[in-house]
């Protein structure tokens, strides 16, 4: 059963404008399925197969000639030199919708695209399924269940999460680590994955992360860079205003799919996660993820930031609009926030003044309502509607 992706219209728009479209994202996020659903008559080449990747490196022109256009080329990071040959073909015939590329190593791919396909390629980052996409497809999944299960498509068409997640980590994450970083101590890397999951939505401290894993801080940086490049984690950068001097400058670490984070952290039921001390952090990661998904699916590259002073006041998420106005968002794992939950929002408003145009507490409320100071307590769905309207 096909679950409609919110990114479908953006892919079609890009294909009408650019000769090439690149869809990046975590492994198994649905990149190939999306393209094959939209373009069922396109020929298909997977560089995930070693023989095809070797042919792309050693005889690229012969390989490309064997696949009629339009063509979907999967996991193009295994032969980045192929991008130069695609560029040459595009320059010889500047027609839209010729090449559809996917890749699971974002940084290396973007470097190749900027060098070879600048101005010729539309780029979309595809996240795992949002809860909104699942609800739109008739999956009546509650927020607590989604928090535990996450959005990898296979899990919503019958896969057993107790079997799927261990296989995913072993097949994809560990393989990428072996191929890219030549790591041989996989149990050590698995401890690192667990440590990251336990720190989701926390300010990143490489020394603490390294110490708890038993590795050097530089190794922690290298491994985290790989997870970021693989779209497994995101680093949420701090917002620096003009009036506050002493701000936390380190980024926050967010595991982008809460289901993967729950598995890595050792939770084995949604009730266990909901009752744990980490529920609030997972909720914040969920809210960040839903906002990031909506933005990516719309082609919106506005950064999602956070704000925290050295003395304590914090705002979980800050979005700066093009005109310089700010949307300040707190994430609370509760149904009924009250005036005691707005301290961070008021501190940011005190620091930034009239630039703060909207304050929201995103919570588990069934119906949005306004607190006495003008802050709105809203559901995730309502928050997404408010952000989309601006």
What residue ranges belong to the model's regions?
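A short beta-strand-to-loop transition that corresponds to the Sensor-1 phosphate-sensing loop
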Residues: 102-106, 112, 128-129, 362-365
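Short regulatory helix/loop adjacent to the ATP-binding pocket of P-loop NTPases
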Residues: 107-122, 139
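Conserved P-loop NTPase "ATPase switch" module shared by AAA+ and STAND
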Residues: 67-82
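Loop/turn-to-beta-strand initiation segments
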Residues: 19, 68-70, 95-100
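Interdomain hinge/linker elements that couple catalytic modules in large macromolecular machines
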Residues: 127-282, 286-297, 302-303, 309
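Short glycine-rich substrate-engagement loop in P-loop NTPases that contacts/grips substrate
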Residues: 42-70
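Conserved catalytic/switch belt of AAA+ P-loop NTPases
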Residues: 83-107, 114-116
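A cross-kingdom feature that marks ATP-driven nucleic-acid transaction machinery
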Residues: 1-4, 8-9, 13-15, 20-21, ...
């Amino acid at each position: 059963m096909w679950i409609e992706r919110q990114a479908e219209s953006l892919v079609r728009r890009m294909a009408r404008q650019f000769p090439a479209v690149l869809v990046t994202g975590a492994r198994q996020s649905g990149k190939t399925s999306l393209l094959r659903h939209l373009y069922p008559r396109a020929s298909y080449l997977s560089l995930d197969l070693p023989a095809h990747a070797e042919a792309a490196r050693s005889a690229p022109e012969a390989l490309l000639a064997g696949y009629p256009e339009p063509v979907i080329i999967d996991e193009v990071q295994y032969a980045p030199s192929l991008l130069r040959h695609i560029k040459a073909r595009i320059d010889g015939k500047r027609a839209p919708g010729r090449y559809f590329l996917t890749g699971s190593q974002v940084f290396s791919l973007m470097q190749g695209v900027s060098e070879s396909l600048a101005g010729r390629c539309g780029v979309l980052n595809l996240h795992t399924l949002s809860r909104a996409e699942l609800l739109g497809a008739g999956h009546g999944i509650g927020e607590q269940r989604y928090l535990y299960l996450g959005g990898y498509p296979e899990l919503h068409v019958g896969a057993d999460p107790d079997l799927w997640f261990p296989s995913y980590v072993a097949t994809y994450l560990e393989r990428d680590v072996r191929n890219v970083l030549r790591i041989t101590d996989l149990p050590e890397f698995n401890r690192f994955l667990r440590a990251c999951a336990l720190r989701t939505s926390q300010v990143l401290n490489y020394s603490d992360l390294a110490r708890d894993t038993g590795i050097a801080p530089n190794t922690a940086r290298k491994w985290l860079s790989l997870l970021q490049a693989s779209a497994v984690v995101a680093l949420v950068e701090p917002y620096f205003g003009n009036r506050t001097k002493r701000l936390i400058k380190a980024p926050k670490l967010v595991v982008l799919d809460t289901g993967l984070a729950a598995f890595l952290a050792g939770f084995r039921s949604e009730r266990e996660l909901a009752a744990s001390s980490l529920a609030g952090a997972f909720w914040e990661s969920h809210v960040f993820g839903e906002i990031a998904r909506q933005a990516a699916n719309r082609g919106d590259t506005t950064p999602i930031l956070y704000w925290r002073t050295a003395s304590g006041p914090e705002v979980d998420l800050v979005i700066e609009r093009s005109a310089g106005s700010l949307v300040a968002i707190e994430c609370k794992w509760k149904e009924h926030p009250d005036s005691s939950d707005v301290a961070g929002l008021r501190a940011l408003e005190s620091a930034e003044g009239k630039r703060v145009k909207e304050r929201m507490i995103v919570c588990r409320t069934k119906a949005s309502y306004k607190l006495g100071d003008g802050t709105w307590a809203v559901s995730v769905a309502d928050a997404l509607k408010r952000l989309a309207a601006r």
